[in-house]
Amino acid sequence: MREHAAWQPQAAAWRPGVAVVPGRPAPAVQRLLTERGSLTARLERLGPVRVHVLREAWQRPAPDEGVALELPVGRHAWLREVVLDCEGGPTIYARSIVPDRLLGPLARLPRLGERPLGRLLFSAADVQRGPLAVARLRGREPLVRWLRGHGLPSPAGGWARRSTLSVAGRRLLVTEVFFPEGVEGER
């Protein structure tokens, strides 16, 4: 897996990596935040992973997501929001934004249903992850509002990460929120 540098996180809440974030996470959380490979595969080593789809639709991404993907303002992208429940491990909210036509392995994205996106992405030989950005959630971020809109508990005090990935020449943005009460048990 090679890295690409198409996006460098610039927003105040997102920091480039765990080392520069105030209030270091617990070691178990830090291991998840810095995972460069498939987070799904890591979770599946802990136990079965269940995917609960919250929303899948074409819509305009949030402004900072559009910037991260270098999208023109107002352009639509495929949005997928899910909750990953890992038996014996953490609970994670994941938000994926895929612009453009869905070609190659990403063409199956709208039909994934309750299968993890990570399996699809990391089965591709040419997957590339951009820089990881990390945020400590304080409760005012758009991510927290989205979670509340889905009736999920507030992740305030928890951690989030995001990065761009490139598969078959198509870039997407994946944001993952680690619920505070669900991460401490991760080994």
From Swiss-Prot:
Biological-process GO terms, alphabetical: pyruvate biosynthetic process; ubiquinone biosynthetic process
Pathway terms, separated by semicolons: Cofactor biosynthesis; ubiquinone biosynthesis
Native source organism of the sequence: Halorhodospira halophila (strain DSM 244 / SL1) (Ectothiorhodospira halophila (strain DSM 244 / SL1))
Name assigned to this protein: Probable chorismate pyruvate-lyase
Cellular compartments annotated: Cytoplasm
Matching Pfam families: Chor_lyase
Family annotation (PANTHER family): CHORISMATE PYRUVATE-LYASE
Record GO cellular component, one term: cytosol
An example molecular function term from Gene Ontology annotations: chorismate lyase activity
Catalyzed reactions: chorismate = 4-hydroxybenzoate + pyruvate
Function: Removes the pyruvyl group from chorismate, with concomitant aromatization of the ring, to provide 4-hydroxybenzoate (4HB) for the ubiquinone pathway.
Source species, domain of life: Bacteria
Record keywords: Cytoplasm, Lyase, Pyruvate, Ubiquinone biosynthesis
Binding site for substrate: 80, 117, 176
Similarity-based family: Belongs to the UbiC family.
Disulfide bonds: none
E.C. numbers: 4.1.3.40
